[in-house]
A protein has these predicted regions:
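Structural/interface elements that position substrates and couple domains in central-metabolism enzymes
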Residues: 1-188
Length: 188
């Protein structure tokens, strides 16, 4: 019914941005004033809130199965800090929560994001402030134990990531959509 400006939304590592993570909860709050149930919206919010935890569980499983490396000793490359592809916006980004969880488990975490060269100050993640994006062209197979794709920017050389031959946890289906080898890729 809407032929122009359609933008499909697909599951990922959690919700981000200025409206979608917040506005449904306003609707829930307002609906309660009229004694209306919004349980479906609340359940969706709970699921979306816990997606970063689910992604970390999948990452831990992959590291255990493919590398025998504990998450507490793992070196993780987080691909994408922006909340959606091809923008420099980190508002409510699930990538910040992912990095916080991984660091909390003792993992060494670096990130690459061509749109976010440095992590800005964020109220909920002050410990991430000032971290800098690493240059992807300088990354070798010995530098990281796994790659976690949180934001699938279009200007990333995913074929080069495939050649690293290390586990990739793909929360955005970036490899399959580009027809790249899936041997080391796990969807999350």
């Amino acid at each position: 019914t809407k032929p122009y400006g359609f933008q499909a939304f697909y599951p990922g590592p959690g919700l981000g941005g200025h409206c979608i993570p917040i506005d449904p909860f306003y609707l829930t709050w307002k609906a309660k004033e009229y004694d209306m149930s919004t349980r479906f919206i609340e359940l969706a919010g709970e699921i979306n809130t816990h997606m970063p935890d689910h992604v970390v569980v999948r990452l831990r499983q992959v590291l255990d199965r493919k590398s025998g490396i504990a998450l507490s000793r793992a070196r993780i490359l987080l691909l994408g800090m922006a909340y959606k592809k091809n923008v420099p916006d980190m508002r409510e980004s699930p990538s910040a929560r992912l990095m916080q969880i991984l660091l909390g488990h003792g993992a060494a975490v670096a990130f690459h994001d061509p749109y976010v060269p440095t992590v800005p100050k964020m109220r909920d993640y002050p410990e991430l402030f000032g971290r800098n994006s690493v240059a992807l062209e300088n990354v070798g197979a010995d530098d990281f134990d796994a790659v976690l794709i949180a934001t699938d920017h279009d200007n990333i050389d995913y074929a080069a990531l495939a050649r690293l031959n290390i586990p990739v946890i793909d929360t955005r289906n970036a490899f399959a959509r580009r027809g790249l080898p899936m041997d080391n890729v796990t969807k999350a």
